């Protein structure tokens, strides 16, 4: 920096101080959903389908996504562009809730193709894409990963 000041990364202690119980619950549920999603999607692929695994992993994934979406409403950020602390990434909350509702509605109507497409979109949109956004510099997880673990920032 031009004035001779050094940029320093927050210490692990400082990062932990920012990790509130709400953020810890949100992050744990999101990481669980990110890991479990492929199992639920995989169990219905190929010649040998595994409906029990698909159903168990699917219900667990839906539960984790509901926890992730609801807990996100209690996490607000006033530094980024926001409305009352809600940033653009919060738009994934109604996307997730309506998507899960729609996926179960498709199941009730026995429209398996629409159910499958909805769940795939939810996984890649609400898990993978949202996860990528959390790794941006300046966000808690991004600062932890890029600054503390890899020392890039």
State where each predicted segment sits.
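Alpha-helical membrane insertion/targeting regions
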Residues: 1-153
């Amino acid at each position: 920096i031009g004035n001779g000041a050094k940029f320093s990364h927050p210490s692990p202690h400082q990062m932990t101080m920012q990790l509130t119980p709400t953020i810890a619950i949100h992050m744990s549920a999101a990481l669980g959903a990110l890991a479990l999603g492929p199992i639920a999607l995989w169990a219905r692929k190929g010649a040998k389908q595994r409906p029990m695994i698909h159903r168990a992993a699917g219900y667990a994934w839906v539960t984790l996504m509901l926890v992730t979406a609801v807990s996100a409403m209690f996490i607000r950020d006033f530094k980024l562009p926001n409305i009352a602390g809600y940033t653009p990434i919060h738009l994934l909350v109604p996307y997730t809730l309506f998507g899960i509702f729609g996926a179960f509605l498709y199941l009730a109507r026995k429209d398996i193709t629409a159910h499958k497409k909805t769940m795939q979109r939810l996984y890649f949109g609400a898990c993978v894409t949202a996860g990528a956004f959390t790794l941006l510099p300046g966000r808690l997880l991004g600062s932890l990963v890029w600054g503390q673990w890899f020392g890039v920032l």
